[in-house]
Amino acid sequence: MPQAIGDPDELERFARALQQFVDSLNDAVGNLNGAFAVLGDTWQDEKRARFEDEYHALVQQLTQFDANASEQIPYLASLAARLRDYLQS
């Protein structure tokens, strides 16, 4: 007999929380990008160049996380719907 393990409500809650986090993260990264661009006009030394490299590496990782999370959110919603249907049958 097939067995379903999971709570569709928990899956949906996590998907919503993940979406809110991704939205918040994207807003924060956008704001920080703007502030960093403006700062480039006044902060120009070797430490800034090193920081910029690290900053861009971090932004790239966050972009990859955003892409991965954006794939998982609809998957989690679909999984919750299928699980709910299964549990109600």
Predicted feature locations:
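N-terminal secretion-targeting helices of virulence/extracellular proteins
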Residues: 1-89
